[in-house]
Amino acid sequence: MKKIFFLLFISLPLVSFSQEWGTVNRNNVTMKEVAPTWPGCESKGSADACFRQMLAQHIGKNFRYPAEAYKNNEQGKVIVEFMITESGTVDIKNISGGTTALQEEAKRNIMLIPKMAKPGMLAGKPKAIKYTVPFNFTTGK
């Protein structure tokens, strides 16, 4: 019995010293949003770059200066804030700047954006992603 207590008494400090002291650093996890996939960009390498390129082409192709606003020399910068929703559709959140006619044209242009082939993603789940697009209306007169 004395031998058991003696072995236990000797091994106790070994257990105590075998534990390491240290600090646990926080793990920082950064999750990157993945842009929605514009129709036709499914096979492209970078969905984000393709989305930006297709959005710029869409805006340029569908841009129209409202005739009455042009005639009245209405100019200004209109900023449209919108979301591409989890279902891949456009949801306008805010329109500011410019005149009412210029705002309506900017809204019309953005609402013509097609439904995305895939929505934006965050951590592997569909995520609504916010975009802000400026429209500069100048008549050059």
Which stretches of residues belong to each language-model region?
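Charge-biased low-complexity segments
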Residues: 5-7, 17-141
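N-terminal signal peptide c-region/cleavage motif recognized by signal peptidases
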Residues: 11-15
